[in-house]
From Swiss-Prot:
Produces ATP from ADP in the presence of a proton gradient across the membrane. The gamma chain is believed to be important in regulating ATPase activity and the flow of protons through the CF(0) complex. It comes from Bordetella bronchiseptica (strain ATCC BAA-588 / NCTC 13252 / RB50). It is found in: Cell inner membrane. Keywords: ATP synthesis, Cell inner membrane, Cell membrane, CF(1), Hydrogen ion transport, Ion transport, Membrane, Transport. GO terms for molecular function: ATP binding; proton-transporting ATP synthase activity, rotational mechanism. The keyword Repressor does not apply. The gene is atpG. The lineage of its organism: Bacteria, Pseudomonadati, Pseudomonadota, Betaproteobacteria, Burkholderiales. InterPro entries: ATP_synth_F1_ATPase_gsu (IPR035968), ATP_synth_F1_gsu (IPR000131), ATP_synth_F1_gsu_CS (IPR023632). GO terms for biological process: proton motive force-driven plasma membrane ATP synthesis. CDD domains: F1-ATPase_gamma. It is a peripheral membrane protein. F-type ATPases have 2 components, CF(1) - the catalytic core - and CF(0) - the membrane proton channel. CF(1) has five subunits: alpha(3), beta(3), gamma(1), delta(1), epsilon(1). CF(0) has three main subunits: a, b and c. This is ATP synthase gamma chain. It holds the Pfam family ATP-synt. Its main location: membrane.
């Protein structure tokens, strides 16, 4: 059985650890609220872009943008979104597992893969497995910089437009609520006919929106022309989805970290209680032994 001094040292060590995890829990809770606000702030933008695009495409049915054209898949691009830091439970492990499964599936179908990594954890994974990296962006901080994200993803978008890849996927963690985050592997390009927002449930698709708008006889005045406006809108829409993927992951990261640190703090409290019980028993045993020795010595005299 460990001595009293050793147990006291362990209790002190666990108490110090609990102070750290408690502080990290509070910091994560504060960052989580801000990350959720940023994540939700981008959703109305995507919804409005979908509505405008629906109207434009209905008014110009003869025009087909490359982002909407299905083609035989021989090569794909994958954007893996992870965190830069750990201590967020199984967040990175879960999305890594899903991504590896999909990459194996592509390999079995003889489909070439080129990857973009957002976050140190994803970069480390793709490097270890020897994936073809065409771009990367790490140390994104607590607030994603759109210019940095677009700079990294431009390679993939250009390759898609030039036909070097036939589809573009994004692997990220979708924020459901504070206690639940789910890894998702979504096709970004070509866009589905409905232009569904992969990060919202119950949102109208482009097709449904177009159907609703079909009663209107008005139209926009285009400058310079409708096709140019559609091109710009779809480009902004895809960029917005990529930003949303990173924002969702950041909100998920802070939520998972807060939950993980709370769990660590609760476990530390339990360990302290167990150690305190052992300490009391050990101390009581030592006192009893000393009393017995004194009584035994007095009887011998």
């Amino acid at each position: 059985m460990p001595g009293i001094k050793e147990i006291r040292t362990k209790i002190k060590s666990v108490q110090n650890t609990r102070k750290i995890t408690k502080a990290m829990e509070m910091v994560a809770a504060s960052k989580m609220r801000k990350a959720q606000e940023r994540m939700r702030a981008g959703r109305p933008y995507a919804t409005k872009v979908r509505e405008i695009a629906a109207h434009l495409m209905q008014a110009n049915p003869e025009y087909s943008h490359p982002y909407l054209v299905e083609r035989e898949v021989k090569a794909v691009g994958v954007v893996l979104v992870t965190t830069d830091k750990g201590l967020c439970g199984g967040l990175n492990t879960n999305i890594s597992r899903v991504t590896l499964s999909k990459l194996k599936e592509f390999e079995q179908r003889s489909i070439k893969v080129q990857a973009t990594a957002f976050g140190n954890k994803g970069l480390g994974l793709l490097t270890r497995i020897g994936a073809k990296l065409v771009s990367q962006e790490v140390q994104l901080g607590d607030k994603p910089d759109l210019d940095r994200l677009l700079g990294a993803i431009k390679v993939q978008l250009d390759d898609y437009l030039e036909g070097r890849i036939d589809a573009l996927y994004v692997a990220t963690t979708r924020f459901v609520n504070t206690m639940r985050q789910e890894p998702v592997f979504l096709r970004l390009l070509p866009l589905s006919n409905g232009l569904d927002d992969p990060f919202q449930s119950g949102v109208e698709t482009l097709a449904k929106t177009a159907e609703i708008k079909s009663d209107y006889s008005w139209d926009y005045i285009y400058e310079p022309d409708a096709k140019s406006v559609i091109d710009d809108l779809l480009q902004r829409y895809v960029e917005g989805l990529l930003y949303q993927a990173v924002a969702e992951n950041m909100a998920s990261e802070q939520s998972a970290r807060m939950v993980a640190m709370k769990s660590a703090s609760d476990n530390a409290k339990k360990v302290i209680g167990d150690l305190q019980l052992v300490y009391n028993k050990t101390r009581q045993a030592a006192i009893t032994k000393e009393i017995s020795e004194i009584v035994g010595g007095a009887a011998a005299v």
